[in-house]
């Protein structure tokens, strides 16, 4: 029941909550928005509880977007409330037009969940499609629990557009203030009250509600607004001085789907929500809404993060089944009896299903980490049952009955079973208390296995003995066929092993030397093996960023993007494409010279290349094929919500407020130095301080001499060139805004100012051109702040076969060498989390080893036995490093990342578990049976060889499918499989010699023979 009710997601809830604050300052440039809006808002938010960092972006379209990233584990709802409370204290400092627009605060994620393309068969325009989505789809999707926001990329939302003709304003001697006043008065909505309302006169019989004429809502009605009346009685209406149309609130974005107009619906989930549940709800709602679509309108899924999640979970389930089959095969090979095989086989469903049953209580979900834990648990949970069955069978072959054999066996194996279980718990439970993303990933993995191991141990001490007494029978004295040949072969190997062990354990210096060489080899390989955080995974889509030369028009960008789009669609591994021109997704701003293409790839089974390989190939192809634009493809980061791209994200900050020019110069110098480093593949930034602009120089003395109020002049320029918001109107059941701006032909270039006039307050129109001069200049398209410092964001991609960890170290070294004290650097997005987690792996390993040592010391009341057990751990670590290092020479994806670290923690427990089987039994034979130390050691090694080989190879075969996994999240499985197989192979093949040798070494150094004599005298 729990399995079917558990939520399915890519990762546990490890994404830091993000609260977004956004607003618009109509007509303002980036610097103005930054100074007037972003700075006061950022100052009010700074220091809010649980904040990690915040980044504000102010753009030339007047928009301000600020994202506050909070600590993992904080409550997103409370984060949003605290942020809103702080923002409210800054509202009084903001310009009036900003507060009129409203300042929105909402919790969201930076990574999108699903992207839909709404298209038609040619009957509808992009304007219609976008507004159909605004009116009929957006709010319905926002109602879904877990949906954070729904952005629509395409033609803007409807707005009443008043396109003024400045020369006609001058002709009719009408000021802008008169136009504003008329539209506000005649286009607004006003209450009227009641006739006979209370307190009423004594003779009032009825009360009537009074209504005014309904608010106007269409272009014709707005055009009929009376602006003024001439002395001759002629009325000047709005349509006489302006073109009025139902247009868009914002222009500048054009979207196409396979060359047809489209509206892109970008759906983001809320922090803490379940991706698959939210995605399924969104899909069901879209299917319901599509039944009401007008004829000719359809929708296509371009990006669906849930598809890769579900496919990845399905693949891991398949891996789990394959592992189960292989484990059963190896058990049957060694036990050679279906009855004996059945006993450990029953331990698997009991332990695995039992663990799933506890998932709801633990707050766990079915995700990549927990499922990988279950795959590895298959090889673990059979170990205890195998040890029991093997011991019982040995006793039965001595002539004991099944019941007596079971009782006798449990006397000898109960202690090792408890010990190995305690060791595994000592490894897994402490590391689950780590913080950060790393700690949360370790938590899901380690607790999943710990629960399975506990159930397995309980099963081995209760159910397995009962089944042994009921099911096991003496095996035939004479065996034939395959099993007979296998037993003869294994018997010879056991004799050879016993002989080799007898010769080996006597050389104490050799044993110590092997341990020392192993530790030295680990240090060398660890130093040279690249490190990283999380591998990039194939999510079924790529994105292509396209950028034309600075200041290019939207039409120029659309043409370039159509060329890129056409080339991308020709690839056989591409299913569909859809793009939005006029939007810079990397910077998060509207930009006429930028655009993004969503590329949906064909199913994983129908293509030979991963999304990363396709992105690399596209980047190379487009660089040559489309020289008129800069185009490069990229994939999303492995953890949704931590940035847009998968590269390294770095913020370069102006710590002393020296200005944009200073910061830009230092950043360019820094980037040039980075490009010379062998660890760096590419360095890019969306920031550019050299964008062609025009500056209007105002001769204030001349303007004032002509009686021009400067406030009126600035308002005139802001309104005519940038547009101004007036009021709202209702239509289609929604509230829309009214904007006033000069018609396009009156803001074509600097010569358009010749038709602009300002009223001097005495009825005279003063031409703007009489006291202004337009000069060419350069400036920025957007301004960024990071933690209140002016900043420039860099995206760095490591060179081939260089990990992100190596690249980040190189970046820090260059920054320390090149940048002055006035300029600082800091990480953001996934890079911030990686840097926070870096260095924690050593603490994890140390914590695991210390807890194992202390646990064993308490269990055995000895310092020597735990030391003998733990000195075998380096072999497993060396095996993992050798295998992963060899794989790295073939593929750069095999590095020391978090999956490698998880594997090493597991190997600490596994190698200690195998060592316990030999060391504890040798200790029993020596102290309880009074055998000679060397003889006890050799006998323990001989008797424990078969169960060690059986449990080790059942685990190795159980994780072997991970090495050969392909498809979704294959990289994570490949790395874990390689590390675990390598570690267990070396720990098994060499460990069976090292385990007894280490016990003998510790016993000799610790003078165990003297201790036994003292115990015997005391007794």
Report residues per predicted region.
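Signature of alpha-helical transmembrane segments and their immediate interfacial
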Residues: 1-8, 413, 482-535, 942
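Extracytoplasmic/periplasmic
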Residues: 1-93, 97-100, 127-156, 184, ...
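Hydrophobic transmembrane alpha-helices and their membrane-interface caps
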Residues: 2-5, 325-394, 433, 451, ...
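Flexible hinge/switch segments at interdomain interfaces of large molecular machines
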Residues: 8-19, 56-62, 97-122, 151-157, ...
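Extracytoplasmic/periplasmic membrane-proximal domains and adjacent transmembrane bundles
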Residues: 11, 22, 65, 91, ...
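Structured binding elements
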Residues: 21, 141, 445, 972, ...
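Helix-loop junctions and hydrophobic alpha-helical segments within the transmembrane domains
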Residues: 302, 309, 313, 317, ...
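Transmembrane alpha-helices and their membrane-interface boundaries in multi-pass membrane transporters
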Residues: 378-392, 413-433, 440-483, 597, ...
């Amino acid at each position: 029941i729990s399995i079917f009710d558990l939520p399915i997601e890519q990762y546990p809830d490890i994404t830091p909550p993000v609260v977004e604050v956004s607003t618009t300052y109509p007509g303002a440039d980036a610097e103005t928005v930054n100074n007037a809006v972003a700075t006061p808002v950022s100052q009010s938010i700074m220091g809010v509880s649980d904040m990690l960092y915040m980044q504000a972006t102010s753009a030339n379209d007047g928009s301000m977007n600020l994202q506050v990233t909070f600590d993992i584990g904080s409550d997103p709802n409370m984060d949003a409330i605290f942020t809103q409370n702080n923002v409210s204290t800054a509202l009084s400092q903001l310009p009036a037009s900003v507060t009129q627009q409203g300042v929105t605060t909402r919790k969201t994620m930076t990574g999108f969940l699903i992207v839909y393309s709404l298209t038609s068969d040619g009957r509808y325009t992009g304007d219609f499609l976008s507004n159909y989505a605004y009116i009929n789809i957006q709010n319905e999707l926002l109602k879904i629990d877990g949906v954070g926001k729904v952005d629509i990329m395409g033609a803007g939302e409807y707005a009443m557009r008043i396109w003024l003709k400045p020369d006609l304003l001058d002709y009719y001697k009408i000021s802008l203030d008169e136009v504003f006043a008329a539209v506000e008065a005649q286009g607004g909505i006003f209450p009227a009250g009641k006739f006979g309302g209370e307190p009423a006169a004594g003779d009032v019989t009825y009360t009537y509600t009074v209504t005014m004429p309904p608010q106007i809502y269409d272009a014709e009605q707005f055009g009929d607004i009376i602006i003024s009346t001439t002395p001759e009685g002629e009325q000047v209406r709005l349509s006489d001085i302006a073109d009025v149309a139902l247009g868009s609130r914002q222009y500048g974005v054009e979207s196409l789907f396979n060359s047809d107009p489209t509206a892109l619906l970008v759906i983001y989930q809320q922090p803490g929500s379940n991706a698959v549940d939210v995605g399924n709800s969104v899909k069901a709602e879209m299917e319901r809404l599509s039944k009401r679509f007008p004829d000719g309108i359809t929708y296509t899924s371009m990006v669906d993060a849930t598809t890769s999640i579900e496919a990845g979970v399905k693949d891991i389930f398949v891996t789990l089944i394959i592992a189960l089959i292989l484990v059963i095969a190896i058990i049957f090979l060694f036990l050679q009896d279906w009855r004996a095989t059945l006993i450990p086989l029953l331990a698997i469903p009991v332990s695995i299903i039992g663990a799933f049953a506890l998932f709801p209580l633990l707050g766990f979900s079915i995700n990549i980490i927990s499922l990988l834990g279950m795959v590895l648990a298959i090889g673990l949970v059979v170990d205890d049952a195998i040890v029991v069955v093997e011991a019982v069978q040995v006793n039965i072959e001595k002539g004991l009955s099944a019941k007596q054999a079971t009782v006798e066996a449990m006397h000898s194996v109960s202690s090792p079973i408890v010990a190995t279980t305690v060791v595994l718990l000592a490894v897994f439970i402490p590391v689950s208390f780590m913080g950060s993303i790393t700690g949360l990933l370790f938590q899901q993995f380690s607790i999943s296995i710990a629960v399975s191991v506990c159930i397995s141990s309980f099963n081995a001490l209760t159910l397995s003995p009962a089944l042994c007494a009921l099911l096991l029978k003496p095996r035939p004295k004479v065996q034939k066929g395959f099993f007979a040949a296998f037993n003869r072969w294994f018997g010879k190997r056991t004799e050879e092993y016993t002989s080799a062990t007898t010769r080996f354990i006597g050389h104490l210096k050799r044993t110590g030397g092997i341990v020392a060489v192993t530790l030295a080899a680990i240090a060398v390989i660890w130093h040279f093996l690249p490190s990283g955080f999380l591998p990039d995974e194939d999510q079924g889509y790529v994105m292509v960023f396209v950028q034309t030369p600075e200041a290019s028009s939207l039409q120029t960008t659309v043409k370039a993007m159509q060329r890129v789009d056409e080339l991308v669609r020709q690839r056989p591994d591409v299913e569909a494409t859809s793009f939005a021109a006029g939007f810079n997704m990397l910077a998060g701003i509207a930009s006429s010279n930028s655009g993004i293409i969503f590329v949906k790839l064909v199913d994983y089974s129908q293509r030979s290349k991963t999304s990363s390989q396709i992105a690399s190939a596209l980047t190379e192809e487009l660089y040559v094929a489309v020289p008129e634009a800069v185009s490069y493809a990229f994939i999303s980061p492995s953890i949704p919500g931590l940035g847009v791209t998968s590269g390294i994200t770095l913020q370069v900050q102006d710590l002393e407020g020296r200005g944009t020019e200073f910061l830009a110069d230092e950043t360019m110098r820094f980037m040039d130095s980075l490009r010379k480093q062998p660890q760096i593949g590419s360095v890019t930034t969306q920031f550019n301080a050299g964008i062609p602009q025009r500056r209007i120089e105002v001769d204030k003395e001349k303007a004032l001499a002509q009686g021009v109020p400067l406030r009126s002049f600035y308002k005139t320029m802001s309104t005519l060139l940038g547009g101004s918001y007036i009021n709202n109107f209702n239509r289609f059941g929604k509230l829309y805004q009214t904007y006033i701006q000069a018609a396009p032909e009156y803001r074509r270039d600097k010569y358009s100012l010749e038709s602009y006039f300002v009223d001097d307050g005495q009825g005279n129109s003063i031409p703007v051109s009489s006291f202004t001069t337009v000069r060419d200049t350069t400036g920025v398209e957007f301004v960024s702040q990071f933690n209140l410092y002016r900043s420039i964001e860099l995206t760095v991609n490591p060179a081939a076969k260089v990990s992100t960890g190596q690249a980040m170290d190189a970046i820090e070294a260059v920054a320390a060498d090149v940048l002055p004290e006035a300029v600082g650097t800091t990480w953001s997005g996934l890079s911030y989390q990686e840097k926070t987690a870096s260095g924690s792996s050593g603490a994890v390993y140390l914590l695991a080893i210390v807890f194992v040592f202390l646990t064993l010391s308490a269990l055995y009341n000895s310092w020597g036995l735990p030391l003998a057990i733990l000195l075998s751990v380096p072999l497993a670590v060396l095996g993992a490093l050798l295998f992963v290092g060899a794989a790295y020479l073939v593929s750069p994806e095999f590095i020391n990342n978090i999956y490698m670290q998880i594997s090493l923690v597991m190997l600490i427990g596994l190698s200690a578990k195998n060592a316990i089987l030999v060391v504890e039994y040798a200790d029993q034979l020596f102290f309880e049976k009074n055998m000679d130390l060397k003889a006890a050691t050799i006998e323990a090694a001989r008797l424990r060889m078969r169960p060690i080989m059986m449990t080790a190879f059942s685990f190795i075969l159980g994780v072997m499918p991970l090495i050969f996994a392909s498809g979704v999240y294959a990289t994570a499985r490949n790395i874990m499989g390689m590390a675990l197989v390598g570690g267990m192979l070396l720990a098994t093949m060499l460990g069976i010699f090292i385990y007894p040798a280490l016990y003998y070494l510790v016993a000799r150094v610790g003078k165990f023979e003297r201790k036994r004599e003292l115990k015997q005298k005391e007794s």
